């Protein structure tokens, strides 16, 4: 089933396996797809003499991973091909104790402290770019905590199950039969959600750890990586404290405007940032969520969930921005159940259906063009009296027969039963007339909101909560610098963020040698 060239590459990946790995396969011999499923598993087993297969008879195809005869808690219902192929390879490597995605001791301790038996099911689409991160993070948790299991489910094979659960977006994670998470996520986010859902013993058992540095960079995107590297090159002790390396870059598919790099992907750029960071003596603490800060003293304090505290005389805030929501009543109820932010991931659920795209910038029009290829009808709603997208995109969308564009239109309400979206209410801003549009789904593309909540009560921010910086990236507080999309710098671009991060680091170093901090 797998191409010979791919199998050769996989052989190289598994060349260092030391544990005995068993793929325990359950299959229905009467299923017409049984031979294809079995062929896939046998192909994987053929890549290493450390991997073998065993077969059991059952209703549905699935297989679990055993290490030295013991269950790891990781299983797959469906063939983990497409974007999930990496999830399978990493699951086997991680089972053997290998892989750069394995967390540090502090995060592992939190995973081990989760309470009770935790049975996870992660519903995915094999074309979803956000799904592998979630599957891989939950697989790691299963390996660390024997009370956790995670089953990847190919939603395309189990449509009845998808409809019964009213899943309209992927990845969708269920814990012990109840919804836990929908959409993009990483180890840190998922761990926090599980701690809130099932409880944890960690807070009572945790040892409070204080880590001291010369410079602490908050955020691991282009601005944060640049700032950390520039600071480390000055011989300073530097730490990055971030939810994930790469930041929002991870959610970008194609990147063609990073000067000197003709074309790359967000995932690749995030990996390249980590590789570059690792070239220097920079301590990376990812999967961390900042819960409190004290930035007004000479020695700044940053506390993260899990009991760690970081202190330094200089802080660079490079926490980036997140997708802006509509800010409408009941919006939380419909996210993942009709309201979405990723057309690539969730668009396939709306094949042959009617959807709307809110936002007429480049992201919104690109989303409309993508969705037009699979949806019956796409309605684009732009708040302003003109679209802001590039002319070439406007021309393209105008040529599509199943796309309709409305300007000067404000979305005022989400309509539905609280579980499933059925439409939206919009207002024509030229005459204040309202009307309802029946829809199956809506994709929100209205820009970004700065991730400044942990700092906005201490440093000066704009009414939009962007951190105000001067030309040298200094904020209103001595020893506190900021860079990238979280700030007032115009034009939120990767190239600009990298330059801003470098400026912030150089300003911090300049203040240090002049005795300002």
Residues of each region from the PLM?
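Beta1-alpha1 glycine-rich phosphate/pyrophosphate-binding loop at the start
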Residues: 115, 121-126, 130-132, 136-138, ...
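Structural micro-motif
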Residues: 55-74, 159-176
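Thiol-based oxidoreductase modules, predominantly thioredoxin-like and allied folds used
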Residues: 49-58, 146-160
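FAD-site-proximal beta/loop scaffold in flavoenzymes
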Residues: 322, 327, 333-349, 438, ...
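A Rossmann-like FAD-binding core segment of flavoenzymes
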Residues: 270-305, 309-312, 317, 372-471, ...
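Glycine-rich dinucleotide-binding loop and its adjacent helix/turn
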Residues: 204-212, 319-374, 468-471
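Non-catalytic, surface beta->alpha helical segment in thiol-disulfide oxidoreductase systems
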Residues: 67-99, 174-202
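Local sequence-structure signature of Cys/Sec-based thiol-disulfide redox active-site neighborhoods
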Residues: 3-42, 111-146, 152
